[in-house]
Design a protein with these regions (language model features):
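Conserved loop->alpha-helix
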Residues: 1-213
Length: 213
């Protein structure tokens, strides 16, 4: 599990693409501390397993499903990526519950400044937007953010300068694709609720008597 608090911005060192998968090598520093092969690191919000460790980088496999569902396929050598190690049991819960399993992608429709705040408007599919609520949490490229406004075709978040400086948001432009993970709590609640309103029971004592019971 992750929290959406980015520890550092890494750089894509290499991408070895196969027919249905890829191997990413990411230059990093902070997230390498204490990391072992088999540990999890979120790369732009996607939980990846470390397969190799180097003095200045790590390598991870990316499966076909992840490539299809995320914006990782848009990465090139030199791309800046947000990195976060899995939260330890005694770690500080600074953001919100982030599984590292992205729901899909969004596209930056607009970026504007409002005094010190920087607003990002993201357009996405209705299947994702149904879980986006005003003042709720959402993960954009691994960053835990609060939804400031919801529209029929997307939503907006308002970020502080510190967040922009400490993440790859300062390198994002209008038209860029980003990974989105909605709040997992909402998805679990939907799954547990009945799929439809139970039908009213029309069986009565009079009906039973008419039928000979």
């Amino acid at each position: 599990m992750f929290t959406g608090i980015v520890e550092e911005v890494g750089t894509i060192k290499s991408i070895n693409r196969g027919q249905h998968s890829a191997v990413l090598t990411v230059c990093a520093k902070t997230v390498l501390e204490g990391t072992r092969i088999g540990d999890s690191i979120a790369v732009n919000g996607i939980c990846l397993t470390v397969r190799q460790l180097f003095p200045d980088s790590f390598a991870a496999d990316v499966m076909h499903e992840t490539l299809n569902r995320s914006a990782l396929a848009q990465l090139t050598v030199g791309s800046a990526v947000n990195l976060e190690r899995a939260m330890p049991a005694n770690g500080r819960f600074g953001g919100h519950i982030v599984a590292g399993h992205v729901d899909g992608v969004g596209r930056i429709a607009n970026i504007r400044k409002d005094d010190t705040a920087i607003w990002y408007t993201i357009h996405s599919d209705p299947a994702i937007l149904r879980y986006v609520v005003e003042k709720g949490s959402i993960t954009i490229d691994g960053i835990s953010l609060t939804v400031a406004a919801v529209e029929p075709t997307g939503f907006s978040v308002s970020t502080i300068p510190h967040t922009v400086r400490q993440t790859n948001l300062n390198q994002r432009h209008k038209g860029d694709f980003v990974n989105l993970e909605t709040d997992v709590v909402g998805k679990y609640i939907e799954r547990l609720l009945p799929s439809e309103t139970p039908k009213q029971n029309t069986l009565t004592k009079e009906m039973l008597l008419r039928c000979g019971f």
